[in-house]
A protein has these predicted regions:
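Active-site-proximal alpha/beta segments of enzymes that process anionic O-linked groups
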Residues: 1-9, 112, 118, 131-136
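…; additionally, a secondary subgroup of soluble metalloenzymes is captured
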Residues: 121-129, 138
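Loop/turn elements at helix/coil->beta-strand transitions in domains of secreted/extracellular proteins
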Residues: 9-15, 59-65, 88, 95
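Solvent-exposed loop/turn segments at secondary-structure junctions
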Residues: 21-25, 71-74, 96-98
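Soluble non-cytosolic domains of exported or imported proteins
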Residues: 34-44, 103-110, 127
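Substrate-binding rim/cap in mid-to-C-terminal beta-strand-loop elements of soluble/periplasmic
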Residues: 81-123, 134
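Active-site His/acidic residue clusters
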Residues: 3-45, 49
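Metal-dependent active-site segment of extracytoplasmic phospho-/sulfohydrolases and closely related
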Residues: 39-83, 90, 116
Length: 138
């Protein structure tokens, strides 16, 4: 709720909202469990509130939404070295994004920072190994 209120009143170019609930439910209850999916449903409602706040602030046409996670999970684990633990969802939405686009190639977490740098027109530092996911843009 506080995020939506902040969005409506603050002047901002970049907002990162971190929600840690799934990071607690996964290791405690297990990934791919009813309680984990219930928490995802709750978080989906929060995302809806944030989108509505952006609309109410009159900034929808100027906003890019990115929803992702810092890691995946297996059973009651908390990240790890398997692909299932390293790959996460990466959802990006904006009027300049191809609607319904699905990545055919592997996308890793470090590609998120590269994509954000690309969005803001920033030069990626040479030491970064990420690739900007420019194929999602129209």
């Amino acid at each position: 709720k506080w995020a939506g209120e902040y969005i409506k009143v603050a002047s901002w170019e970049w907002v990162k909202i971190v929600v840690g609930e799934t990071d607690h439910v996964g290791p405690a209850e297990g990934h791919e469990t009813p309680s984990y999916y219930e928490k995802l449903k709750e978080l989906d409602g929060y995302i809806g509130q944030i989108i509505q706040a952006v609309k109410d602030a009159g900034m929808l046409d100027e906003t890019i939404f990115i929803v992702t996670a810092d890691h995946g999970g297996i059973k009651k684990g908390h990240g790890g070295k398997t692909m299932e633990e390293m790959e996460t969802a990466f959802i990006i939405a904006d009027k300049g994004i191809k609607k319904g686009y699905e990545f055919q190639e592997s996308m890793m977490q470090f590609d998120c920072a590269s994509t954000i740098a690309y969005i803001f027109g920033l030069k990626q530092p040479q030491v970064w190994i990420g690739r900007p996911m420019i194929q999602v843009f129209k």
